[in-house]
Curated annotation (Swiss-Prot):
Pfam families, sorted: H2O2_YaaD
Single Gene Ontology BP annotation: response to hydroperoxide
UniProt organism field: Psychrobacter sp. (strain PRwf-1)
Family affiliation: Belongs to the UPF0246 family.
GO CC terms, sorted: cytosol
Record's protein name: UPF0246 protein PsycPRwf_0637
């Protein structure tokens, strides 16, 4: 069983990693592809980034500097001195729910084996892959040698990595199921026809004025919470995710099918 999440635009560069898991740190599997993309980004001036990414001048300046500072080679890989594990660097609603900073070592190791973080720059990351700060959303129309956007750039690469990681978990006797907790923008980079697994997409609905609907802020946090729930309980069978009950959510069988699992939360529990 394997989970995928979207990354976050906001980054936590200041807080130290809370548990000693340095021997599990790794380089991103698709780092050479990231190098190729960063070469393109390094050629962009702040004004170019502002137009490409629809961001403010301040953010364009910040990310232009990040691009210039970004450096990786086989001789000088990412280390604790110049990078940070992805699961600890990403901030925002999803990662508030995941909250790796409060996780013990066993939980972090589970996450590292069962969670892929989709990324415009790095393709797909393990939580303990070392990365340097960046901004490159998957939907960005960055021209490259493969085409006009990042979906064309990544092609089958991300899916190939996920297939291999799912093979690793299924060989341990786990369900061969991908739990999709990523946004549509990011999951579009996974080629469903090439995926050697069934896909389940949890949907989180919150009650508002007597009606249930997806509220982005709550849904993002719930996605992170579900991955954390799986890690805390060392879940290996998808069926056990139906017991997810953090933050007041509960599984609704009559609204679910084999592809979409619906979880709801009543207004009183928000």
């Amino acid at each position: 069983m394997y989970f995928v999440l979207s990354p976050a635009k906001s980054l936590n560069e200041k807080d130290a990693v809370s548990v000693k898991v340095g021997n599990y740190y790794s380089q991103p599997e698709l780092i050479e592809d990231a190098q190729a993309l960063m070469k393109i980004l390094k050629s962009k001036e702040p004004i170019d980034l502002q137009a490409l990414m629809s961001i403010s001048d301040d953010l364009a300046q910040l990310n232009a500097q990040r691009n210039q500072d970004w450096a990786w080679s086989e001789d000088k890989p990412f280390t604790e001195d110049n990078a940070k594990p992805a699961g600890y660097l990403f901030d925002g609603d999803v990662y508030t729910g995941l909250d790796m900073y409060s996780a013990d070592k066993q939980t972090v190791v589970y996450l590292n084996e069962h969670l892929g973080i989709l990324s415009g720059l790095y393709g797909v990351l393990k939580p303990l892959d070392m990365i340097q700060p960046y901004r490159l959303e998957m939907g960005t129309k960055l021209k490259n040698e493969q085409g006009d956007n990042l979906y064309e750039f990544w092609g089958e690469h991300i899916t190939d990595v996920i297939n291999q990681r799912m093979k690793d978990t299924s060989e341990q006797g786990e369900d061969n199921i991908l739990i999709n907790l990523a946004s549509n923008e990011y999951f579009k980079a996974v080629k469903k026809k090439s995926l050697d697994a069934a896909i389940i997409t949890p949907r989180f609905e919150d009650e508002k004025n007597g009606k249930y609907k997806v509220i982005s802020f709550y849904a993002k946090k719930a996605r992170g919470l579900m991955v954390r729930y799986a890690a805390d309980n060392k879940i290996t069978k998808a069926e056990d995710l139906k017991q997810f009950d953090l933050a007041g959510y509960y599984y609704v069988d009559e609204l679910s099918d084999d592809k979409t699992w619906v979880f709801r939360r009543d207004e009183a529990s928000q």
